[in-house]
């Protein structure tokens, strides 16, 4: 499958109707969002909904998961619960340093090893969204 996407469809991870209906638009990639579109009170339920979506109704396209940023209290729970589902990639928002990306890579690798997933199967897509990230 091509790694260039014409369409990347972002879906709030806490909205079952949108999760179910996302594939109807036939995007090249669906990104389940656990970050900005999900309130702090719904982070756990969003992880559960995305988990069930990928276990029981995985879309026929590339799948990414936008996790919470590296300094967030939700970050490690996002990574540890999503990597075993083997998305094509995790999207790291607000990446500001190489350390942010290295930290995520180490965590993903540990989880891949623990779950007998091929090392490097889950990729990282880092988003630069701040001035510090540009520098």
Model features per residue range: what roles?
Residues 2-135:
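Conserved alpha/beta-domain cores
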